[in-house]
Amino acid sequence: MAQSTTTSPDGGTTFEHLWSSLEPDSTYFDLPQSSRGNNEVVGGTDSSMDVFHLEGMTTSVMAQFNLLSSTMDQMSSRAASASPYTPEHAASVPTHSPYAQPSSTFDTMSPAPVIPSNTDYPGPHHFEVTFQQSSTAKSATWTYSPLLKKLYCQIAKTCPIQIKVSAPPPPGTAIRAMPVYKKAEHVTDIVKRCPNHELGRDFNEGQSAPASHLIRVEGNNLSQYVDDPVTGRQSVVVPYEPPQVGTEFTTILYNFMCNSSCVGGMNRRPILIIITLETRDGQVLGRRSFEGRICACPGRDRKADEDHYREQQALNESSAKNGAASKRAFKQSPPAVPALGPGVKKRRHGDEDTYYLQVRGRENFEILMKLKESLELMELVPQPLVDSYRQQQQLLQRPSHLQPPSYGPVLSPMNKVHGGVNKLPSVNQLVGQPPPHSSAATPNLGPVGSGMLNNHGHAVPANSEMTSSHGTQSMVSGSHCTPPPPYHADPSLVSFLTGLGCPNCIEYFTSQGLQSIYHLQNLTIEDLGALKIPEQYRMTIWRGLQDLKQGHDYGAAAQQLLRSSNAAAISIGGSGELQRQRVMEAVHFRVRHTITIPNRGGPGAGPDEWADFGFDLPDCKARKQPIKEEFTEAEIH
């Protein structure tokens, strides 16, 4: 290095200043010498300058350029040693931030993905995002639903979000908040404010945040609003601050600057807020996401959404229980089977699903229609009535120790001989009266015999009223049996007593052969006492019978039936015990039967000769007129 001998007074100071400003490892090259000499005076002022020759001119220009390039590379590596985009750090950094900005102007591709991930990732520091306890009052400016993982807040209102980590993250860690659309058909769109709020003066004057950003940070001057140059995603980044003493959360105040219902913006499309914990070099240490809704009344909308969610859960549970029954093979029918007509309606209460069944054949269709109508009507029947019906069926199916009722004694061999041509049972068999001189009648009476046996063992007829009443009406009806008029909707004795609150008294009536309420119409309180009904139930049953008789208007034929039925059903003997008799429920009946009359001593026989037959004297005999006798001489002898 050569130095001139002549220097100005300020030359040394200037040189020292320039020399100290140079970096110690910089390399300098000399420029070509100008045509002027070193000692040439300019403008009449004597000046001199020092020239440094660090390289000789003999070195080629290409070699000097290569040396300059290597020197610049070393300088850039020291200036940005922490950049995640250098080859030295590419292998050491496992995960980069999807929202990190390019570190070099030569990068043409953005590292941020087109569709950011919204999967929760606690990471090594157990990153968590929580909210304070909030209410659903209509006056609340924000509220969070843990059930739905959804934040409800008003526009431009402060919403505190708590950040928690289990261990301190590395220095320089930042927290990023980015909005994305929730549904797949909208996820590629960028979430921005609507033009009305973006261009308006409200909430925009005096703000450092860009007008198009939806999310803002309040009370933090270190926040940065980022617009990805390739994907266009907008986000806001704030440095991570450790929690203060005595707390375990770091609170960040966010503002949402547009309503979810704004046209031109979100337009009622649901959004997700993605909160990520990132290092300085862009590595994601944790990720959390939740749904956001910006509305006018957060408390009301939260309550409505939670109620709807619970209803859907109940329906899903009900469908899951009935899922096995709905998955059947008969859902798929052959294509040749015609479809059901418009009259078929498949609707079930409490079930949203509708199923259609195709059936071949009209008869099968009608059977299934009856089943369908029965099931639909079953849903309309009150549960207490169903329980009463089931109790009645259990009582009817209970085995009884009593002998089953019979329609009279079995025909004796003598009756078979004399009545071999008959097809129908005799009058005596229908009314339960034993035939004369029949020793087999007494043991065959059973619990529903035709008469009662007194203490002496003689038969006492108890159905004289019924015989006389039907004797005058035997030729009125043209059929064997005319059905009675509709008395009551449910004539069952079990239903009647259950409705009165006396189900314990059923056995007292059924043990005596009383199975219908029409058998009890003319009972008195004394009769109920004879049936050994408990005293606390007697008055209730008697009043129920009185109300039943007053509420129904029976015809004359029905009244005759009731009188005859009760007369034949209840008879109190000398011992006070009640015996069961045979009851026939019929309004009119006519029996055609040919009987054999033995010889009674000629035409002079009186009416006393007919007393042993057990029925009234025929009109023809009372008028002394001969009756038709249908028998052969061989039968007489």
Swiss-Prot record:
<keyword id="KW-0804">Transcription</keyword>
<dbReference type="GO" id="GO:0005634">
    <property type="term" value="C:nucleus"/>
</dbReference>
<keyword id="KW-0539">Nucleus</keyword>
<keyword id="KW-0597">Phosphoprotein</keyword>
<feature type="region of interest" description="Interaction with HIPK2">
    <location>
        <begin position="345"/>
        <end position="380"/>
    </location>
</feature>
<dbReference type="Pfam" id="PF00870">
    <property type="entry name" value="P53"/>
</dbReference>
<dbReference type="Pfam" id="PF07710">
    <property type="entry name" value="P53_tetramer"/>
</dbReference>
<keyword id="KW-1017">Isopeptide bond</keyword>
<dbReference type="InterPro" id="IPR010991">
    <property type="entry name" value="p53_tetrameristn"/>
</dbReference>
<dbReference type="GO" id="GO:0000978">
    <property type="term" value="F:RNA polymerase II cis-regulatory region sequence-specific DNA binding"/>
</dbReference>
<feature type="modified residue" description="Phosphotyrosine">
    <location>
        <position position="99"/>
    </location>
</feature>
<dbReference type="InterPro" id="IPR013761">
    <property type="entry name" value="SAM/pointed_sf"/>
</dbReference>
<keyword id="KW-0963">Cytoplasm</keyword>
<dbReference type="InterPro" id="IPR012346">
    <property type="entry name" value="p53/RUNT-type_TF_DNA-bd_sf"/>
</dbReference>
<feature type="cross-link" description="Glycyl lysine isopeptide (Lys-Gly) (interchain with G-Cter in SUMO); in isoform Alpha">
    <location>
        <position position="628"/>
    </location>
</feature>
<dbReference type="GO" id="GO:0045944">
    <property type="term" value="P:positive regulation of transcription by RNA polymerase II"/>
</dbReference>
<dbReference type="InterPro" id="IPR036674">
    <property type="entry name" value="p53_tetramer_sf"/>
</dbReference>
<protein>
    <recommendedName>
        <fullName>Tumor protein p73</fullName>
    </recommendedName>
</protein>
<feature type="compositionally biased region" description="Polar residues">
    <location>
        <begin position="94"/>
        <end position="104"/>
    </location>
</feature>
<feature type="region of interest" description="DNA-binding">
    <location>
        <begin position="131"/>
        <end position="310"/>
    </location>
</feature>
<feature type="compositionally biased region" description="Basic and acidic residues">
    <location>
        <begin position="301"/>
        <end position="311"/>
    </location>
</feature>
<feature type="region of interest" description="Disordered">
    <location>
        <begin position="301"/>
        <end position="351"/>
    </location>
</feature>
<feature type="binding site">
    <location>
        <position position="262"/>
    </location>
    <ligand>
        <name>Zn(2+)</name>
    </ligand>
</feature>
<keyword id="KW-0238">DNA-binding</keyword>
<comment type="function">
    <text>Participates in the apoptotic response to DNA damage. May be a tumor suppressor protein. Is an activator of FOXJ1 expression, essential for the positive regulation of lung ciliated cell differentiation.</text>
</comment>
<comment type="similarity">
    <text>Belongs to the p53 family.</text>
</comment>
<keyword id="KW-0043">Tumor suppressor</keyword>
<dbReference type="InterPro" id="IPR011615">
    <property type="entry name" value="p53_DNA-bd"/>
</dbReference>
<dbReference type="GO" id="GO:0000981">
    <property type="term" value="F:DNA-binding transcription factor activity, RNA polymerase II-specific"/>
</dbReference>
<feature type="modified residue" description="Phosphotyrosine; by SRC and HCK">
    <location>
        <position position="28"/>
    </location>
</feature>
<dbReference type="GO" id="GO:0046872">
    <property type="term" value="F:metal ion binding"/>
</dbReference>
<feature type="region of interest" description="Oligomerization">
    <location>
        <begin position="345"/>
        <end position="386"/>
    </location>
</feature>
<dbReference type="InterPro" id="IPR002117">
    <property type="entry name" value="p53_tumour_suppressor"/>
</dbReference>
<keyword id="KW-0862">Zinc</keyword>
<feature type="cross-link" description="Glycyl lysine isopeptide (Lys-Gly) (interchain with G-Cter in SUMO2)">
    <location>
        <position position="628"/>
    </location>
</feature>
<keyword id="KW-0832">Ubl conjugation</keyword>
<feature type="region of interest" description="Disordered">
    <location>
        <begin position="78"/>
        <end position="104"/>
    </location>
</feature>
<feature type="binding site">
    <location>
        <position position="194"/>
    </location>
    <ligand>
        <name>Zn(2+)</name>
    </ligand>
</feature>
<keyword id="KW-0805">Transcription regulation</keyword>
<dbReference type="GO" id="GO:0006915">
    <property type="term" value="P:apoptotic process"/>
</dbReference>
<feature type="domain" description="SAM">
    <location>
        <begin position="485"/>
        <end position="551"/>
    </location>
</feature>
<keyword id="KW-0479">Metal-binding</keyword>
